């Protein structure tokens, strides 16, 4: 019996493939896209599991700076990506998508046909924007208002949000009369309407960047996922949700 047990112990048994979980912090505007990308990537890469959190790109940058356990980032801001690179906290940054800024209002509001952006803002009593210090969409909105010489006039009306999805929810709920969000966010909601598309000349280019966190011990797996965001499969999903192709 002992001999049989010994022989059995010596037999080769197939070892189950080891899986590695990587944690990615992504801009809030990417959540629905990531919900589609995640199962597609994990099916193609069965040894890699993905874990995500979502928020404003500035807050994600601050979490990386404070040493949070993050392997990679997907940011809606070149400024935040460049800041991490300059501090040697991130590497291998790559642009993977673009977007547009729009002004939205609740769907049940009168159409206000013919009103330009300045008139729409003047008509609103509360305007939701992401906090410009931590939310790229809010920074783009502030740049727009400043370039139109409207920021000082409209500043008292601004309701600051922690990320672009909170801006969307404020307008949906009627807690703000108007709000600046990305085109992709507006497309997701049946409760809002796009009142104006913002001229791209009024703000910095809107582009999304991936980057590896330098102190991650899972760089190979992280690189595999970040590279996947530039593949045709991931780009088709981004396009489905209204994102523009990377330049």
Regions found by a protein language model. Give the residues of each.
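Active-site-adjacent helical/loop segments in soluble small-molecule enzymes
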Residues: 100
């Amino acid at each position: 019996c002992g001999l049989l047990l010994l022989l059995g112990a010596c037999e080769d048994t197939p070892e189950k493939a080891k899986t590695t979980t990587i944690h990615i912090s992504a801009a809030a505007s990417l959540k629905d896209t990531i919900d589609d990308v995640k199962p597609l990537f994990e099916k193609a890469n069965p040894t890699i599991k993905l874990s995500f959190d979502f928020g404003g790109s500035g807050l994600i940058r601050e979490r990386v700076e404070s040493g949070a356990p993050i392997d990679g980032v997907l940011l809606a801001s070149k400024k935040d990506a460049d800041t991490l690179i300059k501090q040697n906290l991130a590497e291998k940054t790559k642009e993977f998508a673009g977007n547009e800024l729009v002004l939205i209002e609740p769907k049940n509001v009168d159409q206000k046909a013919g009103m330009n952006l300045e008139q729409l803002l003047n008509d609103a009593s509360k305007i939701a924007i992401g906090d410009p210090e931590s939310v790229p969409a809010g920074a783009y909105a502030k740049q727009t208002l400043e370039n139109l010489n409207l920021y000082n006039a409209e500043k008292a009306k601004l309701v600051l949000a922690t990320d672009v999805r909170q801006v969307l929810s404020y307008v949906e709920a009627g807690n703000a009369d108007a709000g600046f969000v990305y085109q992709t966010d507006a497309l997701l909601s049946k409760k809002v309407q796009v009142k104006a598309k913002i001229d791209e000349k009024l703000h910095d280019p809107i582009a999304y960047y991936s980057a590896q966190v330098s102190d991650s011990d899972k760089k190979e797996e992280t690189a595999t996922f970040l590279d996947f965001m530039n593949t045709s499969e991931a780009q088709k999903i981004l396009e489905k949700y209204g994102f523009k192709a990377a330049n």
